[in-house]
C-alpha cells in the first residue's frame, strides 16, 4: 500500500505510523497507534498508564504501582518494591488470579484454545451470541459502535487539517454520562 501511494500525495496522506491522541470529557487521555508497515516485533500495545499504576499485557506482561497502592495491598506486605520497577512475577500471578474477571475465569481454557488474539476474539463472539440467545442487552451498544468507528474518519479529518483537534460527535445526544459504571448482563 505504501509503495503504491507514496508517490501520489493526493491519495496517501498518512505516514507508516499513525498516532491518534484523544482527551475524554472527564480529562482522561487515550493514545491509539496504528502501524502495519514498518518492520518490528508484533505488539498489541495493550497498556494502561495512570497516576496509581501501569499495566502492560502483550507481549511483555508487567505491572507497576504507586507507593500508596503497594502500601494498601496485602500481597505486597514484607516485599521491597520500587514503584518504578515491575512487581515480582509471583505477586503478579497472585494479583491476576485475585482480580480475574468472572467471564475470563469461566472461559479462559476454551478461549485460549480456539480464539484468536489470546482468546479475546472468542470472548467477544461468545458474549455476543450469549446475549442474543438470552434476550439480553449487548455488552457493546450502537453508541459504542459509532464511537469506535468514527475514530478512523475523524483521524483522517485531523490529518487533512495539519493534525488539528477534531471534536467527536455526541452520538447519545447528551446522555453519554447517564450510565453508571459498566456491567455484563447475565441470564438468571
Predicted feature locations:
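Glycine-rich phosphate/pyrophosphate-binding beta-alpha loops
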Residues: 17, 32-42, 116-117
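Short, flexible loop/turn elements at secondary-structure junctions
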Residues: 6-8, 24-26, 36-38, 52, ...
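Short glycine/serine/proline-enriched coil/turn segments at secondary-structure junctions
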Residues: 9-12, 38-41, 56
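Short, small-residue-biased leader/transition segments that mark boundaries at the very start
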Residues: 1-4
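C-terminal helical cap and adjacent loop that interface with cofactors, partners, or active-site loops
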Residues: 41-44, 49-51, 56-59, 70-188
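Active-site beta-strand termini and strand-to-loop segments that position acidic
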Residues: 15, 20-26, 48-50
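Residue-level structural signal for beta-strand termini and adjacent loop
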Residues: 35, 60-61
